[in-house]
């Protein structure tokens, strides 16, 4: 393990021994790194313009001109008149053959920056186009035949003795490098080309090859060639050539301790390379010193704590030379570390006998053997984490003669490593009071001061340390910087401190992983990958692999983690590494078995039957399902694991809680952590280790933020703040609680206050893209669009290679109504994220470059979801399969899925569309009256406006309705239709008197047809339309309405005013013509009653519209929606009695179950409405619509919705109970004359006729319809299923059934939706 995280044996032994014997203890900083890496996102913080221009040049080299143009346009948006931008613009124009445009760009560049290098380069490029291609081909032939000197002369002549054009510079200097006398000039020229464009892989290859030509730079060239091999996906030709050159260069090298590892590494990847193997066995300069190599490897392994490997290397050396004193002494040190004192003594004595001249090296080790047994016992206790017993034994040992200093130093080191800083400081000062210049005590006390932030005092102590400890002093200074970084939650400050530490210790893997961790927390994941690249690409030491394993594990890259574990000896496993190794083994075994079953539950239970003392097993099983998107079984695994034993260990609680946070269950995580208290042991009686306390604090902060966000989504900002307050107070510098507080203000309808907080965080750390995204959104929410645009532009300039910067830009552009620009922003974000994800996955595959695996996927278990999102369906996932194959990037990566969904939605919103369908509707009732059958063919066109934020919709709906045929022979039905009561009475009277007159005709039924036009405008908070009921119906009405629905946090207010047709019947929908109006009987009646009857009787009646005014409040509280509202309406129609309605309702529904692609909601609804008059009849003046005087209903609706691949569905069913009451109503409410006649007919026929012969007594009794009170069940269903054939074409089928009041209604429709956009 790292020598800076270990404990010394004793001061006396260390001072007198030639080699330090180290005691391995848990690596605190490494474990902290593993627990802190729970979030990731993409970022890069290089100069934006240069990065974009480098990209443009890269795409130009690949001849992908569209990509080059996009990168160049982005650079132009940042600095349109920058010389380097104009230079690349000219290169692009030249590449696509537009020489005139390139010449114009050159003239503009010479005006903007006369004499600049950019102008010169572009001028050279245009000049190169005038070069004779035949001369150039001849020169290239000379170079190809090995005549480099002549070729260089030809190039110089071609360039008129000047600088080569940019496009020919690489081949010119590459040829020059083959001329020994001109090699320095060639190297300088290639170095300049590479510096000007690092993305030029061809130049990188030429430069690396040229360096290998010279022995003084050969190793640097090898390093560059190895780096180039990692760019197989970006530059496959150059990567392959680099591999060939690397192999060739190996054959030029001598075989020595420096070069042998490189050759062995090549052979491990290319075991069939017999030529290189022969070169190693029989090098040109004679055989290598095999014994010396083995001995050197043994001491390196011993220093790294790899005892088994060191023993094997020393034994190999002794097989060659059994009297090798250094190897014998090395075996003695190995035996002493292993606790075998007798064997150690034998080896030391043999080493002293083999070479008396070096005997003094081993005598101090022999002298220390007297107490080594007791120290070995202490080491075993420490290895077993029995720190209390180890401290007691050291205190006893310190009281023995001559052991005070050594035992006290070891005790102080142990106290310091276990967090007892004050006690360690006291012990160090005790030693220094006796031995003021004890070097180890001075360094130990300096470490304490560094950890406490007393940098000045620590450096004063280190100034007293001798030069022989220079390396240790440097390590302590670096440790101090890392301690200072760990004590600040200011991410920008932390990164700055750790960069300073890495500058002092560039190869230290623990510095690198802490810096990478800090960069990830800041959002700079791409930069974090670059920081870790050297140790991941070429892990030299066990510590490199340990740090790499912790990094890749925290990044979720299991394949790379397994790859690094394969190269690490189990002897080098720390507790954290061992836990990771166990988790990888469990996941791999379970994944292979899951592919053979359909139900994973038995396998989960079986996997969790074994003991799980650290929590690694439960986490492994849960994480396997989490990575597959199966949160149901992930939660099940954690629930089983955390309830198998009552007394969970701190490691188990911390591990399970961390995994619960990854699956967004902060409540379960908080419940697991509650027994740990604050970690001091006051609640449990056992204090946690420092790294466990740090993990506990991080989890508690994440839980506070997550619970606050959940309550915020439910609209309970007060309780949300109560949860958040401890996190705000515990660390006032922490960013995530501040951003959560801003979200609370935003949820409370105060986006201005949220913006203030977001801007304050952003001012403190301008690189924090999470804060920048939040600020952009808050600025848009508070109608500060110009500020949002400025903030987003700054983010793009700061981090042009970070997807989140472009997502913020998309928010700003969409708010400004720039639809196409928004899509470009989102596509840019998608491409950046895809590059990262594909790079990560490619690296885990066979033969892929390890450097591409450095960028972890973006997963943030603490990130809140927006209001209302909990009711939406998730992106489709592959269900039912547990194969080990990886999903495609855009479906398995959360950020990619989100961006792809936004692009898809925005493209659809921006695309005009056409819908067409065929629908049928049937409503119960008597034939010829209440019964209604409808067929319609809606044709709808939609035109998006304002970047899809609003739309203009045009529709025309051909419609046919019919009521069936009236039963003309029914003495019950006929009188209740139109004015047929009088006709029936006349006909029966005529028949009774045998007058012989012609009987009046009775209407047999009604059918109507027409088309309904409509124009609608709508956006997120207002909708308005104007149209008409079907033109062609007897009565046509102008219709329309407007609705306002502003939203304040989780609360939506709806206010609407509308005029709509009542479509209960043919009468109410289209109106009816009274056939009696122009009949002989009708004309006779008007003659008799004159003007009085003409005013009360017309040829048509019906066509009822409701003029409705409604208000409603809706509140989204997490997964629950509450609503309540009421309204008032006035119903009018042609020759129909005016009516009025009041209505009110309240209800709620909540999400009761969901997974990645399905949901179930259940609710309750209470409804009331009542009309002033009962107009549910079909005589003249009645409206023909259900209008009870009071109606009450309580229903329970259940909704089931989901989607799978291209199919989606939505089914809602409800059942309830209704009670309604209808008053009696006159036959002819609008005509006193007709009603008077009805009264006369009713009284006469009721008294003198029998029902079989005349009008039904039941029908005409008092000429009033009777009232009624009814109670019973109500309910129905509404179902829709849709299938998307392509991105443009979608087909929907829907059906419904409803029973309410005194009617039932059913309907069905098939419709097609077509988006007018490119495939």
Swiss-Prot record:
InterPro entries: BCSC_C, Cell_synth_C, CellSynth/LPSAsmb/PSIAsmb, TPR-like_helical_dom_sf, TPR_rpt. Belongs to the AcsC/BcsC family. The keyword Cell division does not apply. This is Cellulose synthase operon protein C. One of its GO terms (biological process) is UDP-alpha-D-glucose metabolic process. It comes from the Bacteria. Pathway: Glycan metabolism; bacterial cellulose biosynthesis. Residues 841-855 have a biased composition (Low complexity). It holds the Pfam family TPR_19. Transmembrane segments: none annotated. Gene3D superfamilies: Tetratricopeptide repeat domain. Keywords: Cell outer membrane, Cellulose biosynthesis, Membrane, Repeat, Signal, TPR repeat. It is found in: Cell outer membrane. Required for maximal bacterial cellulose synthesis. It may be involved in the formation of a membrane complex for extrusion of the cellulose product. SUPFAM superfamilies: TPR-like. It is a peripheral membrane protein. GO terms for cellular component: cell outer membrane. TPR repeats lie at residues 49-82, 84-116, 291-324, 325-358, 405-438, 557-590, 701-734, 736-768, 1059-1094. SMART domains: TPR (SM00028). Residues 1-46 form the signal peptide. Residues 841-890 are annotated as: Disordered.
């Amino acid at each position: 393990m790292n020598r800076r995280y270990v404990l010394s044996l004793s001061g006396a032994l260390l001072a007198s021994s030639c080699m330090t014997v180290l005691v391995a203890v848990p690596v605190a900083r490494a474990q902290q790194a593993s627990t802190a890496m729970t979030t990731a996102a993409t970022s890069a913080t290089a100069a934006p313009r240069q990065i974009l221009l480098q990209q443009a040049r890269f795409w130009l080299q690949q001849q992908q001109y569209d990509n080059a143009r996009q990168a160049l346009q982005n650079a132009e948006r940042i600095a349109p008149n920058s010389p380097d931008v104009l230079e690349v613009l000219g290169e692009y124009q030249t590449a696509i053959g537009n020489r005139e445009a390139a010449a114009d760009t050159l003239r503009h560049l010479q005006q903007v920056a006369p004499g600049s290098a950019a102008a010169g380069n572009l001028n050279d490029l245009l000049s190169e186009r005038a070069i004779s291609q035949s001369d150039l081909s001849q020169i290239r032939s000379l170079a190809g035949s090995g005549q480099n000197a002549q070729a260089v002369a030809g190039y110089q002549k071609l360039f008129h003795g000047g600088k080569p054009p940019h496009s020919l510079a690489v081949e010119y200097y590459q040829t020059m490098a083959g001329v020994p006398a001109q090699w320095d000039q060639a190297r300088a020229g290639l170095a300049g080309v590479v510096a000007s464009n690092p993305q030029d892989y061809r130049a990188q290859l030429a430069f690396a090859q040229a360096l290998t030509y010279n022995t003084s730079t050969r190793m640097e060239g090898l390093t560059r060639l190895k780096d180039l091999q990692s760019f197989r996906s970006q530059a496959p030709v150059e990567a392959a050539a680099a591999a060939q050159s690397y192999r060739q260069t190996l054959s030029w090298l001598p075989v020595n301790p420096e070069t042998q590892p490189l050759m062995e590494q090549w052979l491990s990847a290319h075991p069939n390379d017999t030529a290189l193997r022969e070169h190693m066995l029989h090098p040109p300069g004679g055989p290598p010193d095999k014994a010396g190599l083995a001995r050197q490897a043994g001491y390196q392994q011993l220093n790294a704590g790899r005892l088994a490997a060191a023993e094997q290397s020393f034994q190999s050396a002794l097989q060659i030379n059994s009297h090798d004193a250094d190897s014998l002494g090395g075996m003695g040190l190995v035996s002493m570390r292993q606790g075998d004192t007798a064997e150690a003594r034998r080896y030391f004595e043999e080493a002293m006998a083999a070479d008396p001249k070096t005997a003094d090296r081993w005598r101090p080790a022999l002298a220390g053997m007297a107490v080594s047994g007791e120290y070995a016992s202490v080491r075993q206790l420490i290895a077993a984490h029995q720190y209390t017993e180890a401290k007691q034994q050291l205190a006893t040992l310190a009281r023995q003669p001559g052991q005070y200093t050594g035992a006290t130093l070891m005790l102080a080191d142990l106290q310091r490593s276990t967090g007892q800083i004050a006690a360690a400081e006291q012990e160090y000062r005790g030693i220094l009071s006796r031995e003021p210049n004890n070097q180890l005590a001075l360094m130990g006390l300096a470490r304490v001061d560094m950890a406490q932030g007393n940098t000045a005092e620590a450096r004063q102590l280190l100034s007293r340390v001798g030069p022989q400890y220079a390396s240790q002093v440097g390590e302590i200074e670096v440790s101090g910087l890392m301690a200072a970084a760990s004590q600040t939650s200011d991410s920008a400050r932390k990164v700055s401190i750790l960069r300073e530490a890495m500058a002092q210790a560039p190869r230290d893997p623990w510095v690198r992983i802490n810096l990478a961790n800090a960069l990830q927390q800041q959002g700079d994941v791409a930069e974090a990958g670059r920081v870790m690249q050297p140790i991941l690409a070429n892990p030299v030491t066990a510590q490199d692999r340990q740090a790499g394993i912790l990094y890749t594990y925290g990044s979720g890259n299991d394949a790379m983690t397994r790859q690094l574990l394969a190269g690490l000896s189990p002897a080098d496993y720390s507790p954290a590494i061992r836990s990771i190794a166990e988790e990888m083994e469990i996941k791999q075994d379970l994944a292979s078995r899951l592919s053979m079953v359909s139900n994973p539950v038995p396998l989960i239970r079986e996997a969790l039957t074994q003991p799980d003392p650290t929590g690694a097993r439960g986490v492994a099983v849960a994480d396997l399902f989490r990575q597959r998107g199966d949160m149901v079984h992930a939660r099940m695994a954690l629930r089983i694991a955390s309830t198998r034993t009552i007394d969970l260990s701190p490691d188990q609680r911390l591990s399970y809680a961390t995994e619960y946070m990854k699956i967004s269950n902060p409540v379960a995580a908080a419940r697991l952590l509650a027994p740990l208290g604050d970690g001091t042991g006051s609640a449990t009686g056992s204090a946690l280790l420092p790294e466990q306390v740090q993990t506990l604090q991080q989890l508690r902060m994440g839980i506070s933020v997550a619970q606050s966000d959940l309550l915020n989504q439910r609209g309970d900002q007060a309780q949300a703040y109560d949860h958040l307050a401890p996190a705000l107070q515990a660390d006032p510098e922490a960013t995530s609680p501040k951003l959560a507080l801003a979200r609370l203000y935003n949820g409370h309808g105060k986006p201005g206050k949220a913006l203030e907080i977001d801007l304050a965080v952003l001012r403190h750390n301008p690189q924090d893209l999470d804060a920048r995204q939040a600020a952009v959104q808050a600025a848009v929410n508070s109608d500060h669009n110009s500020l949002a645009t400025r903030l987003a532009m700054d983010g793009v300039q700061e981090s042009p290679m970070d997807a989140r910067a472009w997502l913020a830009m998309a928010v700003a552009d969409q708010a400004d109504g720039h639809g196409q620009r928004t899509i470009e922003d989102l596509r840019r974000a998608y491409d950046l994220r895809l590059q990262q994800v594909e790079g990560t996955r490619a690296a885990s595959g066979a033969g892929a470059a390890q450097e591409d695996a450095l960028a972890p996927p973006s997963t943030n278990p603490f990130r809140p979801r927006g209001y209302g999102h909990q009711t939406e369906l998730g992106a489709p996932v592959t269900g039912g399969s547990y194969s080990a194959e990886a999903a495609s990037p855009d479906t398995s990566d959360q950020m990619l899925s989100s961006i792809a969904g936004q692009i898809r939605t925005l493209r659809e919103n921006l695309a005009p569309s056409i819908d067409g369908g065929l629908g049928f509707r049937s409503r119960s009732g008597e034939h010829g009256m209440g019964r209604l059958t409808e067929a319609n063919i809606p044709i709808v066109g939609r035109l998006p406006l304002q970047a899809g934020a609003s739309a203009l919709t045009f529709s025309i709906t051909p419609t046919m309705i019919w009521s069936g045929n009236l039963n003309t022979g029914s003495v019950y039905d006929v009188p209740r239709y139109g004015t047929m009561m009088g006709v029936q009475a006349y006909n029966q009277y005529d028949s009774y008197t045998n007058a012989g007159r012609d009987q009046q005709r009775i209407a047999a039924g009604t059918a109507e047809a027409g088309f309904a036009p409509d124009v609608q405008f709508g956006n997120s908070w207002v909708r308005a339309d104007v149209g008409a009921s079907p033109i062609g119906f007897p009565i046509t009405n102008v219709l329309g309405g407007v609705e306002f629905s502003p939203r304040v946090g989780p609360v939506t207010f709806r206010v609407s005013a509308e005029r709509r047709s009542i479509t209960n019947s043919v009468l109410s929908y289209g109106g009816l013509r009274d056939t009696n109006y122009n009949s002989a009987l009708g004309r006779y009646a008007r003659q008799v009653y004159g003007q009085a009857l003409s005013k009360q009787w017309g040829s048509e009646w019906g066509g009822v519209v409701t003029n409705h005014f409604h208000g409603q409040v809706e509140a989204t509280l997490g997964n629950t929606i509450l609503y309540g509202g009421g309204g008032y309406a006035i119903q009018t129609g042609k020759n129909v009695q005016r009516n009025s309605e009041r209505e009110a309702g309240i209800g709620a529904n909540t999400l009761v179950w969901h997974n990645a692609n399905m949901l179930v909601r259940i609710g309750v609804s209470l409804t009331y409405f009542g009309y002033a008059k009962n107009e549910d009849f079909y005589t003249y003046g009645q409206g023909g619509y259900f209008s009870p005087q009071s109606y009450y209903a309580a229903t329970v609706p259940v909704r089931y919705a989901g989607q799978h691949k291209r199919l989606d569905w939505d089914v809602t069913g409800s059942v309830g109970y209704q009670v309604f009451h209808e008053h009696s109503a006159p036959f002819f409410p609008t005509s006193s004359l007709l009603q008077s006649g009805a009264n006369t007919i009713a009284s006469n026929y009721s008294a003198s006729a029998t029902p079989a012969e005349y009008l039904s007594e039941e029908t005409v009794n008092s000429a009033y319809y009777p009232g009624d009170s009814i109670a019973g069940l109500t309910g129905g269903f509404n179902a829709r299923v849709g299938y998307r054939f392509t991105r443009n074409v979608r087909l929907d089928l829907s059906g419904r059934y409803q029973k309410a009041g005194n009617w039932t209604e059913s309907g069905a429709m098939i419709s097609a939706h077509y988006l007018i956009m490119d495939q």
